[in-house]
Amino acid sequence: MILTIDNILTSEELTELTDILSQGNFVDGQTTAGWHAKLVKQNSQLDKTAPEVKSLEALVINALQRNLLFKLAIHPKHIHSLRFSRYEPKMHYGSHTDNALMGGQQFFRSDVSFTLFLSSPESYEGGELIIEKPEGDLSYKLNPGSIVLYPSTFLHRVETVKTGTRLVVVGWVHSLIRDTAQREILFDIDTVRRSIFAKDGKSVEFDLLAKTHANLLRQWAD
């Protein structure tokens, strides 16, 4: 399941984030790429040792954790390995798949990948996120403060930036539900049960769906 959420950041959070990043020290993005992804990665990233990194990570993680749609669809256990990435003219990230395990001393799975857009789409040419699916490529270039989340199993790439600057936050989620099909089933059931509750209250139909949702979550969560 691929999901987009608009305005995951407030306007104040977006301004704070972009203002701090405009003064940040960016380094070669290849330092955080896997051995094969290094061959196709050309961007820069905020130095992970910079003093502002912790507060910026907390800002983004808090924004995600307070969003109900994110929680219902993703079932996050750990949000991790955030990167504050910048693409300038001629920079790109070729087709690649994300590492299955990420982290420093403690490893987390990459079940769900996300890109949080910080730059206005009109401010740069190119730079689309392309998710490669068997039935065809999907292209994403969202408004600032909006996010796209997708299974980390997909090949994906970032097209070459021709003009302007593309600023994004990328990161990964270790989900309680590792299988994308199971996450989608739970999300669909949850959506229907909430709709029934809104119309009919705590009905017999709601109780049956609530029981099924809870039992599947109990069976699948790890």
Swiss-Prot record:
EC number: 1.14.11.-
Keyword Iron recorded: yes
Reported cofactor(s): Fe(2+); L-ascorbate
Gene Ontology biological process terms, A to Z: DNA damage response; intracellular iron ion homeostasis
Xref: Gene3D superfamilies: q2cbj1_9rhob like domain (2.60.120.620), Rabenosyn, Rab binding domain (4.10.860.20)
A GO MF label: 2-oxoglutarate-dependent dioxygenase activity
Domain of life assignment: Bacteria
Keyword Iron applies: yes
Domain Fe2OG dioxygenase: 78-175
Disulphide bridges: none
SMART domains in the cross-refs: P4Hc
Sequence positions that bind 2-oxoglutarate: R166
Chain positions recorded as Fe cation binding sites: H96, D98, H156
Pfam families, per the entry: 2OG-FeII_Oxy_3, PKHD_C
Official protein name in the record: PKHD-type hydroxylase cce_3668
Organism: Crocosphaera subtropica (strain ATCC 51142 / BH68) (Cyanothece sp. (strain ATCC 51142))
